Amino acid sequence: ETGITYTQVAQYCVLIFAYLVPAIFVSILMTSNPNPALGFGDTLTDSSVYLLDKLDQISIDLGFGAYTEFKKSTIDIFCITAALMVGTAGLPHVIVRFFTVPSIKDARKSAGYALLFITILYLTAPAVAAFARVNLVESIQDKSYETTPAWFKNWEEIGLIAWQDKNGDNKITYASGDAFVPAKPVFDNSSDGHPRHITNKPHKLTDNEVYIDRDIVVLASPEIANLPGWVIALVAAGVLAAALSK
């Protein structure tokens, strides 16, 4: 039991560092605030504009609506919060704490620590998403394929990003709505330095030309922010630790 506990502690240490270190890096770069949860509501380093205000403007320009706009009813918020609380309490990482410690007191303490560190992850998640959205749009919007960052082509090569020039202007347009029909792209060749050919039909009712798999937001965030290679490697190690902890 002690061995299992220390193994889980080691896995979580790798996971939390892999998640927080890139978030702290990006928060410092964008807001000069080392705390991602606080940097989320701080001003940008290159201007006096608040990050949330910029995110609102970007979201509106792309057709998504203001990021901070309150759209849900009170009952919706209550149900979402209740689901999050019950789901967190039922996480295997929390429940297992009651079977790997010798006493009830230790079980309560262990579960308390588990919930504390899970809370840190939850508080950081919105900041990671906000940072990634801003950096993503600024790095690809209205850019030609040839001038897109290396990360765009790397993720395209494995099929998690796709682009199709709908309007023939040779520039990337990222907007709301699906880019293709069906939404998930199907490729028929490798990129070879050019956009991979997509067999899907373009979605005629939207201006969006880009497909980005939502599962890569956390993974690609360090690359999008142009962080050092060791940070990207740390994220990969964290993903492996998360997979092994299930």
Feature locations, PLM:
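Membrane-water interface regions at transmembrane-helix termini and the short interhelical loops
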Residues: 1-12, 94-104, 240, 244
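Loop-to-helix junctions at membrane interfaces in multi-pass transport proteins
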Residues: 13-233
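Gly/Ser/Thr-rich helix-start
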Residues: 88, 130, 239-242, 246
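Non-catalytic terminal/interface segments that mediate subunit docking, oligomerization
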Residues: 234-238
